[in-house]
């Protein structure tokens, strides 16, 4: 294990088998298979165009696949009914590469978006829970009322992570979480991810080009190439 932090459990959270994804005549993934184990930080690395983000979006149901199967928590998300899909979605959180915060909403309101979509909570309880997430990711309380345009790159990443944690997920998907951060900020973010994994019992699926992140934070590394997982 590169990070040497913790041995993952044997339970498989994500099981992908013989997955193929094609856009027009361009086949991006071909016969890809993968297991993600509970409790691990799994890092994905590969040259540009090898399909790291495509695989992530396919797992999340944002890209259609042309072959194979993907089970999340034992459920085939693509073919599941609405209730089963909703149950799966409530158990994951996603941090997209550039944060993807809503520019017209404050940090607090951004964190509350998943709560409004999936839960039936009072405004007071949503405020309290959102403030807890802000503290959890190391932001100061006054960040709650700031808009994304008022945040530094590191603060945007942390605010987006707080939103990803809004529903107390079992797994978080991180797409290039340290891109745009200086080495100190990236190292701090890696430390935060490891701490959250240990304290919250998270499973972490991380796409990254950051070699320091791979060796500092990840328990296991998957190398994508030739349209599948090589290692």
Question: Where does each model-flagged region fall?
Answer:
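The feature captures the beta-strand-to-loop junction immediately N-terminal to the Walker
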Residues: 45-47
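Helix-to-loop junction immediately C-terminal to a conserved catalytic motif
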Residues: 60
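Conserved ABC ATPase "signature" region
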Residues: 76, 123-142
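Conserved ABC ATPase signature
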Residues: 147-151, 155
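Conserved catalytic motifs of ABC-family nucleotide-binding domains
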Residues: 168
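Catalytic Walker B motif of ABC-type/P-loop ATPase nucleotide-binding domains
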Residues: 172-175
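A short, surface-exposed alpha-helical micro-motif characterized by mixed small hydrophobic
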Residues: 214-216
């Amino acid at each position: 294990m590169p990070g040497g932090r913790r041995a993952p459990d044997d339970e498989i959270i994500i099981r992908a088998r013989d997955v193929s994804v094609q856009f027009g005549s361009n086949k991006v993934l071909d016969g890809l298979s993968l297991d993600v184990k509970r409790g691990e930080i799994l890092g994905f690395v590969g040259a540009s165009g090898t399909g790291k983000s495509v695989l992530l979006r396919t797992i999340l149901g944002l890209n259609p696949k042309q072959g194979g199967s993907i089970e999340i928590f034992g459920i085939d998300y693509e073919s599941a009914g609405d209730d089963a899909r909703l149950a799966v979605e409530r158990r994951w959180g996603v941090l997209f590469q550039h944060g993807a915060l809503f520019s017209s909403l404050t940090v607090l309101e951004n964190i509350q978006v998943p709560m409004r979509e999936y839960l039936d909570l009072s405004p007071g309880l949503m405020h309290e829970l959102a403030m807890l997430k802000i503290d959890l990711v190391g932001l100061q309380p006054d960040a709650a009322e700031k808009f994304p345009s008022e945040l530094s790159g590191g603060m945007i990443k942390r605010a987006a992570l707080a939103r990803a944690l809004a529903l107390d997920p079992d797994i978080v998907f991180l797409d290039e979480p340290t891109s745009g951060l200086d080495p100190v900020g990236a190292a701090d973010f890696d430390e935060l991810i490891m701490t959250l994994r240990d304290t919250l019992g998270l499973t972490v699926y991380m796409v990254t080009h950051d070699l320091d992140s791979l060796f500092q934070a990840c328990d296991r590394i998957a190398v994508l190439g030739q349209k599948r997982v090589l290692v």
